[in-house]
């Protein structure tokens, strides 16, 4: 019976050791975090931050809509002016 080569054994052992190491680090980190719990009253309100972000985004959208509306109106006035000017022959 042929023995597995060192390379094939290492391909299995290294990922297995890595997974065990990550699980060990995660367990140690979880036990350290439990002592530093911040009370809910002193934590920033995630919903408040999301609301402020959405308010700023809405203000930006309103500004952009106003700018687009103004730009569209300017372009329409130019087109109307050009159309009116094309109707009248140039006076020389």
Curated annotation (Swiss-Prot):
Keywords for this protein: Cytoplasm, RNA-binding, Secreted, Signal
One of the GO biological process terms: spermatogenesis
Domain of life: Eukaryota
Family stated for the protein in its record: Belongs to the NICOL family.
Listed PANTHER family: NEUROPEPTIDE-LIKE PROTEIN C4ORF48
Function text: mRNA-binding protein which interacts with a range of target mRNAs and may promote extracellular matrix production. May function as a component of lumicrine signaling and may play a crucial role in epididymal-mediated sperm maturation and male fertility.
Name this polypeptide is given: NELL2-interacting cell ontogeny regulator 1
């Amino acid at each position: 019976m042929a023995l597995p080569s060192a390379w094939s054994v290492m391909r299995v052992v290294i990922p297995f050791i890595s997974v065990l190491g990550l699980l060990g680090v995660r367990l140690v980190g979880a036990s350290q975090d439990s002592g530093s719990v911040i009370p809910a009253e002193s934590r920033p309100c995630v919903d408040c931050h999301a609301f402020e972000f959405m308010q700023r985004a809405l203000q930006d959208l309103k500004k952009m809509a106003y700018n687009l509306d103004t730009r569209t109106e300017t372009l329409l006035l130019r087109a109307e002016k050009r159309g009116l000017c094309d109707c009248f022959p140039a006076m020389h």
